[in-house]
């Protein structure tokens, strides 16, 4: 791993930490601010969720459904030109620490305003139906 990749991985980990903190505080607006202005979610069973307002509303809905904590574990970070691809595992917990879902994700990160921000965010569960 190059020094540049190591530094970018650290930047992505810090951004993931902020995502997790905002989630645990029920701060959907704070989560949405971590995305680019034209950011997009690609959730299972749903159409594209485009833009910060829609992203905020999506995460607020998840919080309202009882998800209290999101844990993100990076598996790999790969620099590809002017974007970064993060692959990892996630775990969503409810009140009392009950695991509500777990799975894997890919995020394409893009710099905006000098900061790495989530640009495309896709995930799917590892749980069987």
Model-inferred region functions:
Residues 2-33, 40-129:
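A beta-strand edge to alpha-helix "cap/lid" segment located at domain peripheries
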